[in-house]
Amino acid sequence: MAKRRAAEPVTFHVPWKRLLLCDFAEQPPPPPLWIRPPGVAHAGQLLGVPEQHRKRKIDAGTMAEPSASPSKRRDSGDNSAPSGQEREDHGLETGDPPLPPPPVLPGPGEELPGARLPGGGGDDGAGRAGPPRGDWGVASRQHNEEFWQYNTFQYWRNPLPPIDLADIEDLSEDTLTEATLQGRNEGAEVDMES
């Protein structure tokens, strides 16, 4: 059995990558569309600066002291505070002010408080199970009836009616006895015909 290349199992199911895996010895590779002249810098390089390696060299000094640059110090250059204390208005490591808490997003059956127009939105509450709610504090945290009626395919469905198990048991017993009687009668008719 022939050995496979490492890229083949990953890319062979993609049609346009199959061509990359095939070896075309008959045709030479097309020339690049644009060849950079030797004096022109690439997009991230300054003019007149010789091209350096892309990867940053890491030495032991920068790894030992991560906050060496003044722009990354927590105290913005003020070293009068002890190192154990942190200012409350700054973030943990970056020195940025803390972000405001994210807004509370409503569940799938609810709306944002400012999403409705002041005039009522124009639909007059059509398609709602209950009256429109005015307070969003406690009601948005509780699971409402519309949330539980929303299925996984994100289509609305009608709620199922309550089912009495006694009715199902009675129906299943009646149909079983009728089916067994019909099965016995059909078996007798088949025997008589042959």
From Swiss-Prot:
Transmembrane segments: none annotated. Keywords: Phosphoprotein. Pfam families: WRNPLPNID. Residues 107-116 have a biased composition (Low complexity). It comes from the Eukaryota. The modification Phosphoserine is found at residues 69, 76. Residues 45-138 are annotated as: Disordered. Residues 117-128 have a biased composition (Gly residues). Disulfide bonds: none annotated. Residues 97-106 have a biased composition (Pro residues). InterPro entries: C9orf40-like, WRNPLPNID. This is Uncharacterized protein C9orf40.
